[in-house]
């Protein structure tokens, strides 16, 4: 009996921050910043920064590379990122709250690669700046409109913003583009918005968008969605406004009709991950 109680307490501790509260599944992967610590990657993609470059990125934003203790303090309040990055003194690692088979080797804590002798290795960065102003955010309201930084004025160069939408379990997300004007190029390699039908920007890729044509509406397959906005160091444009509305689960009486209603009315849409209502 004592052993069973002990095992229960261990499991309870492990699940804190990863369960349901007020009908919303809380998963700390959504936290882009905690205790002044935040994750940065190069604008060219993941694992592109040398130690000197990572240090310069943090200092450019008014901060510095996070120490191991600062990263661990952030992890203890829910900071979870599945990407190795430079820390102070040439250390590399990443914070894991929830163990998983594809991230963290099934462990929790700081996955520590130690102090690297080769400072030319390329990783991401973990910066510390408790006073930095970040674009993006986490939304749990049933409907919301969010905008590019400075909208309706043009956005600035060198922006990286994340918006995470997490609704009540069972709901889905109807995403609509109200205004959209980004630098246009054939491969959307300069300025773009990426949409993911998941809780992070690793899984569930839906599409990358640029130019000035309004993308079609998108409906998620679940109650979470992630949007990433990136601008490069040159041309800017008018920016965007994006609206989302929660879609309640289809009632049993309407099953089989392949219909659903939101306050946005009937419009063409792309279902997240190409599923259908």
Swiss-Prot record:
Q: Reported effect of changing residue 55 to A?
A: Decreases binding to heparin. Has normal binding to bikunin. Impairs binding to heparin. Has no effect on CXCL8-induced neutrophil transmigration
Which interval of the chain is the signal sequence? 1-17
Subcellular location field: Secreted
Q: Which residues form the Link domain?
A: 36-129
In this chain the CUB domain maps to 135-247
For this record, the Gene Ontology CC terms, alphabetical, are: extracellular region; extracellular space; ficolin-1-rich granule lumen; tertiary granule lumen
- What turns on this gene? Up-regulated in peripheral blood mononuclear cells, high endothelial venules, airway epithelium and submucosal gland in response to inflammatory cytokine TNF. Down-regulated upon differentiation of mesenchymal stem cells to osteoblasts.
SMART domains assigned: CUB (SM00042), LINK (SM00445)
Q: What is the effect of changing residue 94 to F?
A: Abolishes binding to bikunin. Has no effect on transesterification reaction
Written domain comment of the UniProt record: The Link domain interacts with various extracellular matrix components, including heparin, heparan sulfates, hyaluronan and I-alpha-I complex. It is required for binding to various chemokines. The CUB domain is necessary for calcium ion binding and transesterification reaction. It is required for binding to FN1.
What protein does this entry describe?
Answer: Tumor necrosis factor-inducible gene 6 protein
Gene that encodes it: TNFAIP6
